[in-house]
A protein has these predicted regions:
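Bacterial N-terminal signal peptides
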Residues: 8-16
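Acidic, polar-rich low-complexity tracts and alpha-helical solenoid repeat scaffolds
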Residues: 2-5, 18-264
């Protein structure tokens, strides 16, 4: 009885495999299968309506004509089709395909495109400030590779804009953490985070906030002398900031305070 069941399963699996093989064989007629260009164009027909079927054609180009001009285009088309589907799983597959393309064809005219799109794979799935920023960091790394490896390309220009956006997001994230420490009266931790913004993200658009809360962290930490440069910077460079008046009030408060007696 057991032998009969096993035999039945083997026959069943064989029929399924034969069926799948027949479908693959029937995927492209001989006149298409014998041409790299025809296979590629056949794949293009299905990219939007049946991306999985399109990828079968593209992979047939890659496997059957590995040194063809269309093999490189097919490799990118596979990556782009995964990217276009947009969900987490397909974006991971897209990133893998782009990375492999760059590894195989580093001097290809399409390499800058693949590198930039690799950055987008992480950028498009990155979280808002206040949440895990690992994907933003990965995106920033890949965009920086774009401008380093391909500095004169259009993709480098696009990457520079994305770098600014990534750094703005990371700065805002760091500020959110610093503000949390400030409100928790953990002033040593808040100053550390806020100084990190000054050091790593000097173009952050919320720099007036950084100067105020950095100054006020030192002020509340009983280090008023260290707060003066930051309050002064805020008042001088951002006079229209909503925090400028508070910074000015702090400076007056520090000025009126009796000098601290130093021990001899």
């Amino acid at each position: 009885m057991k032998k009969s069941i096993a035999l039945f399963l083997i026959i069943g699996l064989g029929l399924v495999a034969a069926s799948c093989g027949a479908k693959k064989a029937a995927l492209a007629p001989p006149e298409v299968a014998s041409s790299d260009e025809a296979l590629f164009k056949e794949g293009e027909k299905y990219v939007k309506k049946d991306p999985e079927r399109a990828r079968l054609f593209f992979r047939q180009v890659i496997d059957s004509f590995p040194r063809s001009f269309y093999a490189q285009r097919a490799k990118l088309a596979v990556a782009d089709s995964y990217f276009a589907e947009g969900d987490e799983g397909n974006i991971i597959l897209a990133a893998s395909e782009y990375r492999e393309f760059i590894s195989l064809h580093p001097l290809s005219p399409s390499a800058p495109y693949a590198q930039y799109r690799l950055g987008l794979c992480f950028y498009d799935k990155s979280a808002k400030p206040g949440r895990d920023q690992q994907k933003t960091i990965q995106a920033l790394t890949e965009f920086k590779k774009t401008i380093t490896a391909y500095p004169l390309t259009e993709e480098a220009k696009l990457a520079r804009a994305k770098i600014k956006e990534c750094e703005e997001r990371l700065a805002e994230h760091t500020f959110t953490i610093g503000l949390h420490y400030y409100r928790s009266e953990a002033y040593k931790a808040s100053t550390s985070r806020l100084i990190d913004i000054l050091t790593n993200y000097p173009e952050y658009t919320g720099m007036d906030k950084v100067y105020f809360y950095l100054g006020d962290s030192y002020f509340n930490w009983q280090k008023a002398d260290q707060s003066i440069p930051y309050f002064t910077k805020l008042v001088t460079d951002y006079p229209k900031s909503k925090l400028a008046a508070k910074a000015e009030a702090r400076l007056k408060e520090i000025d009126k305070a009796p000098p601290v007696k130093t021990k001899k």
